[in-house]
Amino acid sequence: MSGNPDAFENDPGFPFLGMSREAKAASAARPFDSKKNCWIPDPEDGFVAAEIQSTTGDQVTVVTVKGNQITVKKDQCQEMNPPKFDKTEDMANLTFLNEASVLGNLKDRYKDLMIYTYSGLFCVVINPYKRLPIYSESVIKHFMGKRRNEMPPHLFAVSDEAYRNMVQDKENQSMLITGESGAGKTENTKKVISYFAIVGATQAAAGGKKEEGKKGGTLEEQIVQTNPVLEAFGNAKTVRNNNSSRFGKFIRTHFSGSGKLAGGDIEHYLLEKSRVVRQAPGERCYHIFYQIMSGNDASLRGKLKLNNDITYYHFCSQAELTIEGMDDKEEMRLTQEAFDIMGFEDQETMDLYRSTAGIMHMGEMKFKQRPREEQAEPDGEEDALNAAAMLGINAEEFLKALTKPRVRVGTEWVNKGQNLEQVSWAVSGLAKAIYARMFKWIINRCNKTLDAKEIERKHFIGVLDIAGFEIFDLNSFEQLWINFVNERLQQFFNHHMFVLEQEEYKREGIAWTFIDFGLDLQACIELIEKPLGIISILDEECIVPKATDMTYAQKLLDQHLGKHPNFQKPKPPKGKQGDAHFAIVHYAGTVRYNANNFLEKNKDPLNDTAVALLKHSVDNNLMLDIWQDYQTQEEAAEAAKAGQSGGGKRGKSSSFATVSMIYRESLNNLMNMLYQTHPHFIRCIIPNEKKASGVIDSALVLNQLTCNGVLEGIRICRKGFPNRMLYPDFKHRYAILAADAAKDSDPKKASVGILDKIANDGNLTDEEFKIGETKIFFKAGVLAKLEDLRDEILSRIVTMFQSRIRSYLAKAEVRRRYEQQTGLLIVQRNVRAWCTLRTWEWFKLFGKVKPMLKAGKEQEAMGELAEKIQKLEEAVQRGEIARSQLETQVADLVEEKNALFLSLETEKANLADAEERNEKLNQLKATLESKLTDITGQLEDMQERHEDLTRQKKKTEQELSDTKKHVQDLELTLRKAEQEKQSRDHQIRSLQDEMANQDESVAKLNKEKKHQEESNRKLNEDLQSEEDKVNHLEKIRNKLEQQMDELEETIDREKRSRSDIEKSKRKVEGDLKVAQENIDEITKQKQDVENTLKRKEDDLHHASTKLAEEQALAAKLQRQIKELQARIAELEEELESERNSRQKADRTRNELQRELEEISERLEQQGGFSAAQLEANKKREAEIAKLRREKEEDALNHETAVSSLRKRQVDAVAELTEQLETLQKLKAKGDAERAKLQRDLEEAQHATDSEVRARQEVEKSYKTIEVQFSELQTKADEQSRQLQDFAALKNRLNNENGDLNRTLEEMDNQVNSLHRLKSTLQSQLDETRRNFEEESRERQALAATAKNLEHENEILREHLDEEAESKADLTRQISKLNAEIQQWKARFDSEGLNKLEEIEAAKKALQLKVQELSDTNEGLFAKIASQEKVRHKLMQDLDDAQSDVEKAAAQVAYYEKHRRQFEKIVEEWKKKTDDLASELDAAQRDNRQLSTDLFKAKTANDELAEYLDSTRRENKSLAQEVKDLTDQLGEGGRSVAELQKIVRRLEVEKEELQKALDEAEAALEAEEAKVLRAQIEVSQIRSEIEKRIQEKEEEFENTRRNHQRALESMQATLEAETKQKEEALRIKKKLESDINDLEIALDHANRANADAQKTIKKYMETVRELQVQIEEEQRQKDELREQFLASEKRNGILQAEKDELAQQAEAAERARRNAEADCIELREQNNDLSNQVSSLTGWRRKLEGELLAVHAELEELVTELKNAQEQGQKASADAARLAEELRQEQEHSMHIERIRKGLELQIKEMQIRLDDAENAALKGGKKIIAQLEARIRAIEQELDGEQRRHQDTEKNWRKAERRVKEVEFQVIEEKKNEERLTELVDKLQTKLKIFKRQVEEAEEVAASNLNKYKVLQAQFEQADERAEIAENALSKMRNKIRASASVIPPDGFPLAQSPSSALVRSASNARFL
């Protein structure tokens, strides 16, 4: 940086761009020994600096900077550059060029965040991962128009060089910003575009014209605002980059011939369409989706029908939803603002949003497969309706187009059914196509806006930003194309830097040895794009029938594996890597590619039927525009029928335009464009993978430097000649360096002469330049040296020219004064003579006669002069006309010359190309001639063979013709066979499907037939057996009559119980489902938790046994806190005494100040002072000096007191640290005890292994829960990251509370670990319960209870997690407040010299905070103790559950014993955590109180700052006054001049005051958002302004009235004032240092205030979230109410059913009276049936047999028997259903509904059959009654089970009600918090209004004072004018006196004969006449 301007070093961005002079000097002074200092390899840092100690052979012993002594080989050591090259700005200047030096230089610069470094001809930039102040407008102005060597490395320097090259060379430029993904390409692109926009606008402004954009803003604003639009729709989050450009863009900024901005355009490449529908883990979809959902526009989501949360929409919620550090709401606002500036219409913007929302709705469209059909159908139409509404099409037609698209079969169009997979692909493909075409439309729309047609476009500068090289765990089709494009760009760089450069040297005839840098990438490029390459084979596979991704991968392996060095077989995946099918060796590394979906992505098929709908969209014009150029197959067919030439093209050939073809064409166009421009390269580097600022991963950076060719670029830049100029250009620019040599007309000879002259002068050497055929070549930096020489000569010439002009002007002024002097002397002499002769009579006569003698002559002379003037004017006009004609001719000739020059240059370039081609042709000719000789010899041999072959040919030709015919026939046959094969395959598939369906039908029929045959056989056997039992039926009837009454009662009870059960089952179903899911999840987690248990169980036991010790320790800490509070009280008293002393000193100072002002007034009022008065003044000044010394001593004492306070505080912190160590020891003891518990758990684990094996089949169904578990795991990871953030924030707590907070955090971590342990243990117990559910109904009921408890625990755990998060937020806020307290304490310490009364208030506020934090800690520990009570309650509940389990089985009791031990501890900690959650509310209230106190402390410190500022201004004013008075005394008696100086001084002071007022007003406007301290600033500024203006007004009056007397009196006190001046200067310096400290503290306060504002915003977000939760709870309550109403309806239905059953009972009663005779026998039969009830299945079979026998014997009672059989079957089904409900609770409600319907049908049938039975035999009725009685007994058993379950359901309901009440209580508390925040906001707004009024009052006061001052200033100006008039009069009077004394009156007639005297005489004569 040879010419860095001094002004730039003061810019805030300079430290991040270059080194200061002092830093360079310090670096250069570092000791260095070139023979000893070196670099050696290091595994961590790449290379490390070392010093050679000794050398032995080829071994070198070195000592590294780390202090390690290492022996390495000599060839491993690399040279180190001298210290003067430290942090060098251009690595091409390094003395030793090696990897170690380059890496070391980049690391040193990056450590200071100097991210830009030149590397020869290009610039290297390292991503800083933070915002730097190096892109501001001030930095742009510094770089604008500067040469590269004048400024430090910067992107702007390269941009300005490109701009100057474009303007000077009239050549298009390009800037290639390349690098890997995440290296910062997009950000640098935005900065480059902004720079060109500003430069172009500045050029336009310099030309007097500013180009306005078409609609929304200026053209430069529109160019800049394209970035937000493109980023919103084209950027997304990837694993390596939060704002990765997922498309490439080439932005061309056009300029006019004069460099004015003339518009721009954009071309895009490789948009990643697949991201719209799929995102990998850790990534996100395009930003626009999340911006729309951010809620920036409250009404927008409603218009777009996006009423659900973002997680509902599958297309954009597959991975990440937010980005750290990015506010989607703010980004949405910027995007909308960019749309407005770009001139987008509102309808256009809304269509974009609607289309985007339509894609989101398309992702939620559900389809399902029809049973036994290859046809998909819609599964719900809500999302389809929304999508169609957004796209402007009909929903029904849209769904039909997706499920049954129209296809062409022969010559007809039919609807083809699609299966589920095909429909899903069609939806995804259509969504991708819509988004891609929409993005293309946005590009075209931006180009339309940027097209400034009124300005002619001459040249452009293009900026290329394309996706960087990507190597992911899973690389697909998109990564292949991105990496291929980067491969082409790297090849372009290598070709431009290394090949073209050296070829041009050879063309120009320069002696040069070709260097092969080994960077040719052509092999990899040909592997991908050449015929039979990867892309070619892919396109071929896309048109091959039945081709798949696997066949494509296999073809690649067969074609290239082992045959091409860049193609490899992929290695097995490691870690998270996905499967791969092939690998390619790129320049940046080997990439493994997965070939899945390659063919589908390359073909990118679309559903033509759906596209046809979109082409006719109704109310979305965007759809019409983007699909306008798309031609469907139907449209192509119609066009072909109509005879249009392009009709069939779309349907056939264009369908094979694959994505690869389109990409390849656009890439070739891009490369052609780049080859036609002059490129500038920006290489972006990723410093590390962790996105950490200031950290360099040496291996990663070295790999990128090697791949990018950085070292090779530096080498060729140093060895070669990177700069060159044509001979005419060189002569034109540098002729001034050798004017004589440049006179030659031949540009080449003139240029050589100029260079010889420069070389002879010693400014250049022959090695620094070379003479070519058409150009001169220079080494790097030579042109800069020539520019410096040129500037130096121009400076000398301009200086000499200026001196000549000044000399001429001075001489002309001397001549003018000499002539003036001569004329004045003559006039004076004539006047004196006239005064003497005016009374002489002859002179009077002469005066009368003289005019008459010369009047005629004068008239003639005047006439001649008029004629001459007229002739001269005509001649002048003719000359002007001729000159204008000549100027026109000259301009035409200049234009012709320029045109000829350009054509000459073009011809020269063409000539050079022709010569190059000629040379290549000559070489080719020589090669061909050598080949020709070889071929001639071969030809002779071949002729001989030809004769032999000719004979054979004739014989073979006949055979060949026959074979050809045969082959043609075979081909024709083969084609026909192929067509028939395809049609038959289709028919076979359809027939196979039909056969499969028919086979299924046949199988079913056979099965039914067998079943019927078996039933018939059984019926025949049962009929025979039942004939013997008919006699016994009458006996059973009598027994049934007695049981009929019981039946009626049982039915009533059953109906009531069923209604209750139906009501409760809906409620229980949700809990059961959640419990089942939790059980499944816990089972899946079991294996993972087993290892965790081994580490965590010791903590559990330790926590239970050591809780009492921790509570005792907490009490001890509380006592110590109280002791610290007592110490603080003592310190408070000491501060009070210090404050009193400070107040006393201030009062003394104020009194002395007033005395000093009174003395000054007396001095000005009195004319002089006596010696006694002067002596008194000296004494007073001595007293003032003494008081100042005392004041300084007081300040020192105060600092001593503050230091003692700090020391005491440090001691207290040390004690707390010791206590923390004690806690850690206790924790270690607990770890030992936990090991014992682990052994017990292992024994229990062995017992459960057998049960685990039995549940393996059940675990298969748990696979569906894995996704949920992964989500929970993700949440756990997020919580872990939150804990890490919490730990990082906790480290910033002050020393007073840090240890206590860490203790609380450890306890929280233990609580969390115990909860996780509890959940694990609970899962084991639940698994044990589920194993015994099948053994006993009681155990099943108990398991259901346990599931409910587990559900409750899960809800409580979620509540605990939410409260833990809120607690973490609160803790972070407390840490921020504590950090702010520390800052204010620091300011308190540094501002001890000012206002101790405000410090007193700040100290009290700090003490209050400490007291409140102590109380908070006491509350925490007290609430921990209170958790014990809740623990006992839960233990009792668990004991009850345990007793139930013990009744079930002894084995269950064994497991329950261990469970109780674990659950006691877990539930204890759970309740403790719940209390901690409630405690958070109190902590939040404490936090608000702390915030209030902090604001008070800020106010006090702001007052201190204002007071210091006023003191500084007073001291500055006094010092200036002393200086002015001293200067006045030194100048003596020049009183008037002194008055003027005083006036000017007062004006300066007035300007300072005005400036201070303006600054205060600006500060008030800027700090309106910081309302908490604005009031103090405004009031202080207003009082200071009034005070200062009043003082100055008094000073003005006193000064104007008494300035003469003050000057005389101050002469005697000059020595005393001199001493006072020195003292004032010393105080001034001290105050200035204090002011700097206060300004730093003020910046801290501003940042703290901004953090507080962020906290307020966060609270507002919390309030909104709570409102959402309230709405969700209300919705749940409504659902419960609806369920209750539904249960009541079911109860009514069952009541009606009961009435029907009562009627049935009456009918049965009538049958009972008819069968009374056989009652005894029926009773016996009933006893037998009762014994059979124990086995439900056997009882059911027997009952069926009896019913069938009765049916065969008594045809009249068939109906009643069938009815009884159905009732028996129903009873069995009911029993089976109840058992099934215990295993599968989610199907329970469906069973109830089916049972209800079945009962209704059965009751109707039974009523009919009972009526028939009255007319039948009596024996049949007895049988029916017996069956009913059996069914009653079964129902009674079922009823008992249902009653037990009903009781459990009621318990769960009561628990749910308790949870609802808890939630309602939380909602009330959150509402209270919201009301408090609202009140706070209202107060802040009121204060803001007050502040604004105060500002307006201050402005009015300032304006009135300013008017007063202007009046005084006018009076002073009048006095100055009067003084000047008096001085002029006095000087004239003195001159008259001197003139009258020196002139002697003449005695005669001494008139001088001169023109002047003649003129005087003529005037005299005229007067005489």
UniProtKB/Swiss-Prot annotation:
GO molecular function term, any single one: microfilament motor activity
CDD domains, per database record: MYSc_class_II
Superkingdom: Eukaryota
Chain residue ranges for the region called Disordered: 943-967, 993-1029, 1134-1153
Residues where N6,N6,N6-trimethyllysine is found: K130
Pfam families found in the cross-reference section: Myosin_head, Myosin_N, Myosin_tail_1
Residue ranges, compositional bias (Basic and acidic residues): 1001-1029, 1137-1153
Region of interest (Actin-binding), residue spans: 667-689, 770-784
Coiled coil: 853-1941
Family, as annotated: Belongs to the TRAFAC class myosin-kinesin ATPase superfamily. Myosin family.
Function in brief: Essential for muscle contraction. Involved in ovulation likely by regulating the contraction of gonadal myoepithelial sheath cells.
Record's comment describing the protein's domains: The rodlike tail sequence is highly repetitive, showing cycles of a 28-residue repeat pattern composed of 4 heptapeptides, characteristic for alpha-helical coiled coils.
Protein's UniProt name: Myosin-3
